[in-house]
């Protein structure tokens, strides 16, 4: 646009289209040179929408697709060459046939557009692959990579969920009842115990089997009290009083009491006697108490009582005399 001259109608229309390029749906049979600046501002989706409305635009928008290829796939290869010219022709004709087969009826127009779009490089002597074809190829490859990544992510997520299900803690309504029901049909494996535990457990079973009451209870033991010598009642030095004999009843003589013989204190054997072995000879049994002579008859108090016995015989008049009562007090 030159300064000093008012803008033309074509320039004003291009400015309006550039301001509202997102709302552009169809350009009809407008030449590419008029809408070039508008097409360079569009995205890939908008450009495809215009190609569906105007199929002949597909043979002229190589510059717009090349700019989109560099913008959306900056790391990919932007120029690919093929040796056969027929491959490029077949791609263009197939694309036009999909969008609008009525365009192919004008053979002269199609031939002129193809001749301008397909050019041989003077250095490589090859034909350049259309940028539109490269863009679509990269889009499909990117979608395939995303699909593979999503599949791997789903697989890893599924494995994590399965591992969580294995170690998941489930809450039971009645765990005691279910435990009895499960343990009724199978035997639980015995856990590995140490030798010290098994030994103590065996001793506990032996004690329980011995007492038959589950163990020793110190609170239920029987207490037996033994009387000490100081708590025993002291022996009386005097005999208990006896009731007087009735007249006319014969009195039985009391058996004489034998004195308690003091047991000799054993002396400690000497060192030579301790070394001697016990003799194998049989010792004579001790004499029975009945054969021992009582010391009552050798007591001096008996001689003093004999004259009195004679006097009593004369007084009784032939009746058997009463035997005297003799009390022997043995000092302790």
From Swiss-Prot:
As part of the CRL3 E3 ubiquitin ligase complex; polyubiquitylates monoubiquitylated RNA polymerase II subunit RPO21 to trigger its proteolysis; plays a role in global genomic repair. PROSITE patterns: FBOX. The gene is ELA1. PANTHER family: TRANSCRIPTION ELONGATION FACTOR B POLYPEPTIDE 3 (PTHR15141:SF76). Signal peptide: none annotated. InterPro entries: Elongin-A_domain, F-box_dom, RNA_pol_II_trans_fac_SIII_A. One of its GO terms (biological process) is transcription elongation by RNA polymerase II. Residues 320-332 have a biased composition (Basic residues). The lineage of its organism: Eukaryota, Fungi, Dikarya, Ascomycota, Saccharomycotina. Residues 228-332 are annotated as: Disordered. Heterodimer with ELC1. Component of a CRL3 E3 ubiquitin ligase complex consisting of a cullin, the linker protein ELC1, the substrate receptor ELA1, and a RING protein. Interacts with the large RNA polymerase II subunit RPO21 in a manner dependent on DEF1. One of its GO terms (cellular component) is elongin complex. Residues 296-309 have a biased composition (Polar residues). This is Elongin-A. Coiled coil: none annotated. Belongs to the ELA1 family. Residues 24-68 form the F-box domain.
